Amino acid sequence: MNKIAGYVLSVAALAMATPATAQFQKPEDAVKYRQSAFTLMGNHMGRVGAMVNGRVPFDAKAAQDSTRVLALISTLPGQAFAANTESVQSKALPAIWKEQDKFKAGYDKMVAEVAKLDAAAKTGNLDAIKTAFGEVGGTCKSCHDNFRAK
C-alpha cells in the first residue's frame, strides 16, 4: 500500500504543479482523468464502507490506507471540469457548467469531508470513522443528485 500511496503522491504533486489547461491535450483526456480519479475514489470508499457497514471485519490500518489514498485523489478531479469538456459524452450534467459556484462549493465540501474522514481513520476509532464516512457519502450523494446523469 505504501508504494501506491507514494505513486499517488507523485501523480498529485505533478498534477498540482502543472496548470490544468496544459495537462490535457484534448477535452477527452480531461474527462478520462476525472473519471479515473472518481473510479479510484469509489473503490476506496467501498473498502471503508465495507468495514463501516460490517460486511468485513474492521481493520484500522486498512481503513487508514484507504482514506489516505482517498484524501489525495479527492483533490484531483476538480481541475478536469474545464469548459471545453462539457460537450464530451459522460455522466456529467450541463448543470456543472451552468451552476459552477454551486458545483465548486459541493466539490470543496467533499474534499473537506474526505480530509475529516482521513483524520478520523488515523484515530482508529470505528465510530468516528462511521460518522465521517456518512458525511462524505452525503456530499457524494448531493453531487450525484444534482450534477450526474442517472
Segments (PLM) and residue ranges:
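Bacterial N-terminal signal peptides that target proteins for export
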Residues: 1-8
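Bacterial N-terminal signal peptides
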Residues: 8-15
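N-terminal signal peptide c-region/cleavage motif recognized by signal peptidases
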Residues: 17-19
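Sequence context surrounding c-type heme c attachment/ligation sites in exported
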Residues: 24, 28-60, 66-150
